[in-house]
Amino acid sequence: MIESSSFMKKTSSENSIGSRSNIHEASTFSSEHENGDQSLTISQIVIRSDFANETSERQSKIILERFNEGIKNTAFTDSPVLGRAQPRLDVSYFAMAHRNQIVELFDPRGQRFGTVYSADPTVEIRYLGSVAKTCRYFGSFGKHVLNVPSGHFAKAMTKNRPIIYGEGPHVIIDPTFEFDERYGFVNQQEPFINHSTINILRVPSGKVAKVWIGTQPLILESRREPYVFVDAQFKMVEDTSESGNNKYFKNSSATFMEHGSIKRIIPHTGEVAITYNNGILTIIPPPKDGKPVIIDSPTHNFEGFIQTSLQTCLFPSKETKQQAIKDNKNATSDEVNLKIFQTRDSLRVGVVLVVAFRIVDPEIALTKLGKEGIINHIENVSFADMGKAIQLSTLQEIMYFNDTKPSANSTNETVHTIQDRVKSHLARDLCEYGIELARLQIETMKVLDSEIAKKLAGQSVTSAEFTTKQATLVKEYDIKTTEARLKAETDNIALEQKGKAIIAEAQAKLESAQKQAQALLITAEAQKKVQEMQGELFTKYPILAEIELAKIKSEALKSATLYITPQDAGNFMNSPLVYMDRLLGHQQKLEK
């Protein structure tokens, strides 16, 4: 037998064609194998094809080599003349025949061929037909070729034991080999693959699976690698309410899951799990490692969860109301929905209490009261303390019951109000049972005497009218005050803006005057420097002084009328400049 095992034994050489050592020798084991306690893997139970990655030409050669191994006398011939001629086949087909039930494959490669003719009556040679090289399964008389598609497994039987083949071609020489092509191929991604005693289980993310191995329960968490079991006593627990693959799995986020003696618990923040280990109370808080708590003991029982976060209850509770109806079918709605007490001034009042509490020590609370007795105890002691307080108080005192939290001086023996009388006693009582009182309030209070109730209602209406009127007056006062404040602020803003404008204008004028003065100073300084430079220049070059003096004189004579007498004409013509100097000097003397 060449291939047919649930556990493969690989040899060192896998490449030489026709070598006996490269073939996966098959040996099957029953489910009671020696290594039953060890975890199995896919590679241990699935037979891999050792030539799946070869070329198609090489795969065909390997199939022919292995299929025809040990055949001495062939049933085929390349010359149809020497035998029984067969129709020409496509290159993608094998021809198959047998000699005395020894099956043989032949690859004609598109050429003419035939089967051998034998005159020996003891020799039977029969042509079995053609098969495609890609055919998923073919074979006869104990020789088989199995081409497993990509992404699939093939489930077969050998020696009445299951065997699974991986993708790729396989050549099996085994007279006990059985394979049904209709049901034998299975997708590798199937969450649960069952083949007789072989079981492959893939638990998806966010799911868990419940299984039995004989009488041993297992809860399998999600993981990347599949779980593999080879055991005839393996059994999956299915959920009959689900269909498809969902019936095999449960949500991993379930707070509690039980399977045989295994308990899988996930307490959430704000609660703890109640368990009893051999009858002893065991509290399980939320795990800090983020993993579920697994208990594997038939005598360790799970009772439930109890909240440790803040709880708020309305009393009378629903159960108390139902019991009141059961005790008195003619009870009125007030008698059912309210707890009735009598005040010190003999008035009947009905109340509804709001109690907020937190269980700070679950072990003490459960040990002393039990899970179902906690709420009942809180309700009973709340009404008991409230009843005592109401009996010692008048209706008016009760109406001013406003404080809702335990008094800061609750340990003080001197109490002055109904709040202290109720809350201090209740807080001390609950503390002994591992319970912390967070809030106590009368949610509803009703005076059952109709006449008193009407008077109180009238007082309430009058008080409401006065309150409304007072609120209106206060509102009007606030409006007028706001308007006056807005007007004053507006006027202040206007004055402030006007003052800023005047200051800005004066500042601008001051800056302008300063700049003009600076300009005059700069101009005078410049003129002074120019005159000093001209003086230095005229001193160094006198001719320039004379030229400048001539310019001044010419400017002075531009608009003047000069009268020259005949006796001065000769002097003027000889030296005009000298004549003009004398004339100007004479004129200046006359002016003096």
Curated annotation (Swiss-Prot):
Q: Which CDD domains match?
A: SPFH_like
Extract the ranges annotated as region (Disordered). 1-35
The residues the entry assigns to the signal sequence are: none
Q: Where is the composition biased (Polar residues)?
A: 1-30
> Where is the segment annotated Oligomerization domain?
491-555
What are the alphabetically sorted keywords of the record? Coiled coil, Endosome, Lysosome, Membrane
Q: How does it sit in the membrane?
A: Peripheral membrane protein
Q: Listed GO cellular component terms?
A: early phagosome; endosome membrane; lysosomal membrane; membrane; membrane raft; phagocytic vesicle; plasma membrane; vacuole
UniProt KW Transferase keyword: no
Predominant location of this chain?
Answer: membrane
Q: Which residues form a coiled coil?
A: 480-534
Where is it localised?
Endosome membrane; Lysosome membrane
Could you provide one GO biological process annotation from this protein's UniProt record? regulation of DNA-templated transcription
* Subunit: Homotrimer.
Its domain comment says:
The coiled-coil region is essential for oligomerization and binding to vacuolar structures.
Which family does this protein fall into? Belongs to the vacuolin family.
Summarizing the function annotation, the protein's role is: Negative regulator of late steps of the endocytic pathway.
User: What name appears for this protein in its UniProt entry?
Assistant: Vacuolin-B
Name the source organism.
Dictyostelium discoideum (Social amoeba)
Q: What is the lineage of its organism?
A: Eukaryota, Amoebozoa, Evosea, Eumycetozoa, Dictyostelia
